[in-house]
Amino acid sequence: MSNNTTSLPAENSSHPRKGTPIRKKQREEAQQFINTLQGVTFPNSQRIYLQGSRPDIQVPMREIQLSPTQIGGSKNEPRYEDNEAIPVYDTSGPYGDPQAKLDVHNGLPKLRAAWVADRQDTEALASVSSGFTQQRLADEGLDHLRFEHLPRPRKAATGQCVTQLHYARQGKITPEMEFIALRENMGRERIRGEVLLQQHPGQAFGAHLPENITAEFVRQEVAAGRAIIPANINHPESEPMIIGRNFLVKVNANIGNSAVTSSIEEEVEKLVWSTRWGADTVMDLSTGRYIHETREWILRNSPVPIGTVPIYQALEKVNGVAENLTWEMFRDTLLEQAEQGVDYFTLHAGVLLRYVPMTAKRLTGIVSRGGSIMAKWCLSHHQENFLYQHFREICQICAAYDVSLSLGDGLRPGSIQDANDEAQFAELHTLGELTKIAWEYDVQVMIEGPGHVPMQMIRRNMTEELEHCHEAPFYTLGPLTTDIAPGYDHFTSGIGAAMIGWFGCAMLCYVTPKEHLGLPNKEDVKQGLITYKIAAHAADLAKGHPGAQIRDNAMSKARFEFRWEDQFNLALDPATARAYHDETLPQESGKVAHFCSMCGPKFCSMKISQEVRDYAAAQEQAAAQAQAATPTTAAQPIDITQPINMLQSGMEKMSAEFRSRGSELYHRPANLSAEANNEPT
């Protein structure tokens, strides 16, 4: 990025909150973040690229460098054994490459532009198709807000379908599919250590998890509808990724401005921040002013797929009056967003007129914003949902730009009391019907799920979805497993997310600490993402996804060997891990200490285990040397009790040490310090 200070466009607003000191500070901080934006990676990590079959297929990974393990020698001449670097999945795009030149005013490099052009089945449009977009472009009063370098939108050529599902069904392996295969394998072919490659068998609940993911396997899964590649031809900046239960569990982050808070620069900041902390996709749920302009800035700077809920913007166009929505206006909104580059639309097309009365006896009614909008429209007109009625036309639009459909659960339960009720599953069955229609047009589909569901009722959600939605990928909000923890709903939902991810859910929509309370800020986004990356990883481990345990094994080895710096660097959040450690052991000596602050130097279980192991090994070596010096015959039996006796001897020695210190579990720090210095206590 240029060193010159630049500014994102300022929004003019008469809203009173915009002028408050807190709002001003937030915007200034976001502007500073944008001004100083440069590619960065985590401590002791480096960006690497896995090369594909053509020069422009380069898959980014983050490689965590580890320190060597001391395996012997003396204090003055120690002997070391190298530890392998650990490659990990990286969603940060160019923002995670210290060599990248970044400028949000120009946007990211168009990674996929050549791939789209090479297929020769699209054409650049002479002008935008959306009447609303034409109005915005003609409004000179918006020039100060507009992304300056607007690309010309593309569309499928006449008679062509440009979806990844269409190519997959034709037997074509696209560059996107090859990119994904390399990415999903996470570079684990680079790992050679037997300890790192050990993994417990998983329980996959019917998922098929091959040892090595190939581009052909990716093609097969997409062709079968079990996975989607959200990749609008007008969002060439995005790096290909896949959502499906036979792949790594993915995480979505929600961002977006509202009528009372946030600005364009803050949303761009949240986008970059989200990709840094592991968001596989990002949904722009903006409902405030300048939705169109905000989305353009986000898309041009996003290395991950972007999803939206188009009904939110359509509602803004009718000043929030749901009854005034029309199909024509909504269709124009779809064209507007498809030509900007939105990768997937959430549509609440399964909220049917006859299902609305089913929610009357619920404790919390209809809690989905999109679901309530469509329910109100249906009741006010006493007509069927226009999204359902015009679903085939929607599919035709999506097929022309490769916009995936995320069929929304507008009747999801908003409390555990309402979980798994008649309305929820009636809508789910309708989403299965719509899935088949979308597939007729080669449009990619995933299914959205709840919501609030107690643990014992979660698995049924997965089995119902697989059966009635024909194994299309499932994408759930949590689910939250209890309703008693406002402020901690990233925890209540993370529990449910880990469970449903294990059962086969393909993507988890994060929940932040602000759920039910307010709009998330930057720190809330991080907390939600870390929680959900834990849930997704736990699900991958439980399923037995090949290679999922490598990072865990590396962490455990570093922990046992007291390699503190490696423990920090292998963590999902290295800075927090280091900060917690340094609260009690801030000195540099604490980074090499063979104990932690919980047990201290005199009662560390791992230190004791190492001492016992070393003692037993020394005893065994001495016995072997003695035996080698004694003539034996081939018929002499081997004494298998010797190693056991040696271990017992080691344990007895440590027991004596424990008793000699007074048989106390814990010791005062002053006493430990005095003992270490041979002072009286």
Swiss-Prot record:
Recorded catalytic activity of this chain's protein: 5-amino-1-(5-phospho-beta-D-ribosyl)imidazole + S-adenosyl-L-methionine = 4-amino-2-methyl-5-(phosphooxymethyl)pyrimidine + CO + 5'-deoxyadenosine + formate + L-methionine + 3 H(+)
Locate the compositionally biased regions of type Polar residues: 1-13
Co-factor binding comment: Binds 1 [4Fe-4S] cluster per subunit. The cluster is coordinated with 3 cysteines and an exchangeable S-adenosyl-L-methionine.
List, alphabetically, the InterPro entries matched. ThiC, ThiC-associated_dom, ThiC/Bza_core_dom, ThiC/BzaA/B
Q: What is the official name of this protein in its record?
A: Phosphomethylpyrimidine synthase
Annotated binding of [4Fe-4S] cluster, by residue: 596, 599, 604
Question: Region Disordered: start and end of each range?
Answer: 1-29, 658-681
Q: Which UniProt keywords apply?
A: 4Fe-4S, Iron, Iron-sulfur, Lyase, Metal-binding, S-adenosyl-L-methionine, Thiamine biosynthesis, Zinc
User: What family is this protein classified in?
Assistant: Belongs to the ThiC family.
Q: What class of enzyme is it?
A: lyase
Give me the residues that bind substrate, please: 254, 283, 312, 348, 368-370, 409-412, 448, 475
What does this gene product do? Catalyzes the synthesis of the hydroxymethylpyrimidine phosphate (HMP-P) moiety of thiamine from aminoimidazole ribotide (AIR) in a radical S-adenosyl-L-methionine (SAM)-dependent reaction.
EC annotation from Swiss-Prot or TrEMBL: 4.1.99.17
Under HAMAP family, the record lists: ThiC
**In which residue ranges is the amino acid composition biased (Basic residues)?**
15-25
Q: Where along this sequence does the record place binding of Zn(2+)?
A: 452, 516
Q: Name one GO biological process term.
A: thiamine biosynthetic process
One family name in Pfam for this protein = ThiC_Rad_SAM
A molecular function GO annotation? zinc ion binding
Keyword S-adenosyl-L-methionine present in the record's keywords: the answer is yes
